[in-house]
């Protein structure tokens, strides 16, 4: 009988210790034996694409980074030459206390637009003649546009900056596009007819060399 009581006591103690070891920890930085890390979240102040006339000083609106509700220092790479036309990319990065990083980018366009192009508004939807896929132009400054789906490729999520510096001349200046790829254009033409049409070749690692023609809708 004594042996039975001893056995039951040992079993009870073992079970109690086991339950103690299996206690679940659930705090803001730990779940069980796993450590929780909070990646930095970067929030841009102002627009992700900013256009300024050539010769205008550029002042960055800034960016805020947080991890688990606490501010995290931000490092900025890239520069803007406000006296040279072009499309510039600024990259912001932040690292949390565990060494994990996150980034965000801003595009800055420095432009010079002639009076005969400044009055143009090329905004609108243009259908590619090959497949009907839509490229959407949005004017953000005189002679400066964002173009979603510039290649007229179904299923794409690419946005670029296009310029109309004079008359009806158009182009995609060399830039890092929204998907991080180097992108530009060649063989561009725009005809201000009714409906308007334009053509260009997209220079991008994932695009071919075909001339792409679009008609305004």
Predicted features, each with a name:
Residues 114-217:
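Ser/Thr/Gly/Pro-rich, low-complexity flexible regions
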Residues 2-43:
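Bacterial Sec-dependent N-terminal signal peptides
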Residues 27-30, 103-108, 211-215:
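Edge beta-strands of extracellular beta-sandwich domains
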Residues 24, 97-105, 206-208:
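Short, exposed coil/turn segments at beta-strand boundaries within extracellular/luminal domains
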Residues 100-118:
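C-terminal edge beta-strand
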Residues 21-23, 33-68, 131-134, 152:
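Solvent-exposed, low-complexity, repeat-rich "mucin-like" stalks and linkers
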Residues 69-101, 111:
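Serine/threonine-rich, repeat-prone extracellular segments and beta-strand-based repeat modules
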């Amino acid at each position: 009988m004594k042996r039975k009581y001893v056995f039951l006591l040992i079993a009870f103690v073992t079970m109690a210790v086991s339950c103690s070891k299996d206690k679940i920890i659930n705090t803001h930085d730990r779940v069980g034996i796993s450590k929780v890390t909070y990646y930095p979240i970067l929030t841009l102040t102002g627009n992700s694409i900013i256009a300024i006339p050539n010769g205008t000083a550029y002042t960055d609106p800034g960016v805020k980074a947080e991890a688990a509700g606490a501010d995290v220092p931000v490092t900025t790479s890239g520069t803007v030459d406000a006296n040279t036309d072009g499309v510039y990319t600024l990259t912001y990065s932040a690292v949390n206390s565990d060494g994990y990083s996150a980034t965000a980018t801003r595009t800055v366009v420095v432009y010079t637009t002639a009076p005969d192009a400044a009055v143009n508004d090329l905004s609108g939807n243009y259908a590619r003649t090959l497949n009907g896929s839509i490229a959407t132009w949005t004017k953000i400054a005189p002679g400066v546009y964002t173009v979603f789906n510039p290649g007229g490729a179904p299923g794409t999520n690419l946005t670029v900056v296009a310029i109309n510096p004079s008359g009806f001349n158009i182009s995609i200046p060399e830039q890092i596009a929204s998907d991080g790829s180097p992108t530009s254009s060649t063989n561009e033409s725009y005809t201000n007819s009714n409906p308007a049409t334009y053509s260009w070749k997209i220079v991008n690692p994932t695009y071919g060399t075909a001339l792409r023609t679009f008609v305004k809708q």
